[in-house]
Structures are given as structure tokens and as C-alpha cells.
Regions:
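Non-catalytic C-terminal accessory region of glycerolipid acyltransferases
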Residues: 2-5, 102-214
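Structural motif corresponding to alpha-helix initiation and N-cap regions
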Residues: 26-29, 77, 99-102
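Residue-level "edge-of-site" marker
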Residues: 30, 97, 155
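Short, flexible active-site-adjacent loop segments at beta-strand->alpha-helix junctions, enriched
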Residues: 30, 48-49, 63, 72, ...
Length: 214
């Protein structure tokens, strides 16, 4: 409840700020299937171009509290880390073998919540072409909890005067439609991970075409 109330406070007070910083224009792969209104449990996946991808996602889906997995790099910062925890950020230490955050995600989903994940796991470095290879955590979580996946792609066009950020929301991926009973759990996780990455790549191309059209 606290995270929800704090989210609403930040969204209401921060709306004018995000408008000038991002001024996000939102497109849809198919609005009749997936809009900005998320009902029930879901896993939101996004490409990862900037630390500002999270607030863009937060304001893209304003009616829900997005519980994003966040790395130790930001969560260990004294002020920022506390602020992100208050918003509902889920601490993920990529340098350890502590997977307790997955149990926390499962609990949130069991209560109808929304988990946010950037499956690339980190920002691309100079010379790397995004999207990077996907980690398998999002696929594992979706399959074990039978949770629909909502894909989202952003162009990372933030803080640019007289330019807008652009986001496209894709149609949901139902993990049960992807899973093959003839495959092992590991193979199904790898298969769903490939499907998710292919979807993000496809949405990225679609977003590029839509922005050119205006």
C-alpha cells in the first residue's frame, strides 16, 4: 500500500517535470489488444538504453505501480536507493548468487502486481549494438507464475529540446502459448527468452517506422 501511495504522489507531483523532460509519444502494436491500462498481474519487459527508462515506463503506465528490478549500482546510492525502494524498486545484486529477489517477484505477482524487467541486465557499452543478449530471469518468472508478458520499447530520446521520447507498447506474450510440453524446463525458458528478444527487436523496427511517419 505504501509503494502505491508513494507512486501516486510522485506521479502527480512529477507529471509536469516528466512532460518537459520526456514529452513521451506512445504508439501501439495493436491498441485493441494492449493499451496503457494493465489489468491483473503482468511482467513488463523493456529494452534498456538509459537509467531514465524506468521513469518513462512509470509514466507510460500511470495507473499501476511498476515494481522494477533494479541493479546494485543504483540501489546502493544513499539517497537515490532509498527513493527507488520507496517507489517499490526490487534490489538485484548482479555480482552475487542471491536470488531471493525472484521469490519477492513471485509474491508480488501472486497478489496481482506488475513486475518490470529489463532483460538485457545492463546498459550497452560503447560499440555494442542493442538490444544485448537477454538474461533468462524474466522468462523463468513468467513460466513459473503463468504471467503474461507486456513488451515495451523506448527510443531513449530524453531531455532533448523540442524533441519527444517515443515508446511503443506491444501485444502481450502468453508464456503458455510459447511453452512446448515436449521440451525441458530449461529449453522452454531459453525458447521464451528468444521470443521476447525477437519481439523487442520487431517493436524497435516498428517504432522507428512509426516515428518517421510522424
Amino acid at each position: 500500500m505504501f509503494h502505491t501511495l508513494f507512486n501516486w504522489f510522485v506521479k502527480v507531483t512529477g507529471w509536469p517535470v516528466q512532460y518537459f523532460c520526456f514529452h513521451t509519444k506512445i504508439y501501439y502494436e495493436d491498441k485493441s489488444v494492449r493499451s496503457r491500462r494493465i489489468r491483473g498481474k503482468a511482467i513488463l519487459i523493456s529494452n534498456h538504453l538509459s537509467v531514465y527508462d524506468y521513469p518513462v515506463a512509470m509514466f507510460t503506465f500511470p495507473t499501476r505501480t511498476l515494481r522494477f528490478q533494479m541493479s546494485e549500482l543504483v540501489m546502493k546510492k544513499p539517497v537515490l536507493g532509498t527513493f527507488l525502494r520507496m517507489l517499490g524498486g526490487i534490489y538485484v545484486n548482479r555480482d552475487s548468487h542471491d536470488f531471493s529477489f525472484m521469490a519477492k517477484c513471485e509474491k508480488i505477482l501472486s497478489k496481482g502486481g506488475v513486475i518490470g524487467i529489463c532483460p538485457e541486465g545492463r546498459l550497452p557499452m560503447k560499440g555494442e549494438t542493442p538490444p544485448l543478449a537477454f538474461k533468462t530471469g524474466a522468462a523463468y518468472l513468467a513460466l513459473t507464475t503463468d504471467t503474461p508478458i507486456i513488451p515495451m520499447v523506448t527510443d531513449g530520446n530524453y531531455f532533448r529540446f523540442r524533441q519527444r521520447a517515443h515508446v511503443i507498447i506491444g501485444t502481450p506474450i502468453n508464456p503458455s502459448d510459447v511453452a512446448d510440453p515436449a521440451l525441458s524446463d530449461k529449453e522452454n525458458i531459453e525458447k521464451l527468452t528468444r521470443v521476447m528478444r525477437e519481439k523487442i527487436i520487431s517493436l524497435g523496427k516498428m517504432l522507428n517506422e512509426r516515428t518517421k511517419e510522424g
